């Protein structure tokens, strides 16, 4: 944590000679997809980034959804299990407590151990789990099926709440 305010935006503008906007990755993804990508021409969309956590960027009626504190669309904090794991922000059952990179790896290690197979978290990255699933590994296949179910729960909640024109999914886990 920085102990003083650093004018990053102004420093970047001066160095680049261009206007700079600072935002989180999911909002930037949503804006780019809306203006130039898969969401071009749509008036509403939801972008989900799947990586270390689950991020979100939302466009509604041709406007980025920001919220009162500019922190709307923190979709990783959406609960999918009302009695689930308690996360670092105090919410229970937040989806990113189940399908973020680290959580997937930890769950895979646990499931492999239950089958008598010793794996480290470094051997259970999304890429490793993808390769294992493509090779027919039942543990990896079930883990991805469970991940898809949880992601589907989040998407259905968003669908019934926002009724967007599209959902666009990206990020390291999504690859």
Regions found by a protein language model. Give the residues of each.
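Generic enzyme active-site microenvironment
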Residues: 23, 31
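A short, polar/charged loop-to-alpha-helix boundary motif
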Residues: 71-84
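Active-site glycine-centered loops adjacent to acidic/histidine catalytic or metal-binding residues
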Residues: 25, 51
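A cytosolic small-molecule/anion-sensing beta-strand core signal
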Residues: 60-61
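Short glycine-aspartate micro-motif
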Residues: 45-49, 55-57, 168
């Amino acid at each position: 944590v920085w102990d003083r305010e650093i004018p990053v935006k102004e420093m970047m503008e001066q160095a680049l000679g261009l206007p700079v906007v600072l935002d989180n990755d999911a909002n930037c993804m949503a804006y780019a997809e809306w203006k130039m990508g898969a969401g071009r021409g749509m008036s509403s969309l939801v972008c989900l980034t799947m990586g270390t956590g689950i991020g979100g960027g939302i466009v509604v009626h041709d406007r980025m959804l920001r919220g009162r504190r500019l922190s709307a669309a923190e979709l990783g904090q959406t609960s999918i299990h009302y009695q689930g794991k308690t996360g670092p922000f105090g919410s229970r059952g937040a989806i990113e407590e189940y399908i973020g990179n680290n959580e997937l790896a930890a769950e895979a290690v646990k499931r492999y151990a239950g089958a008598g197979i010793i794996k480290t978290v470094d051997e259970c990255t999304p890429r490793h789990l993808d390769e294992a699933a493509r090779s027919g590994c039942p543990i990896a296949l079930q883990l991805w099926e469970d991940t898809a179910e949880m992601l589907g729960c989040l998407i259905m909640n968003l669908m019934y709440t926002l009724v967007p024109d599209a959902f666009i999914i990206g990020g390291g886990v999504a690859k």
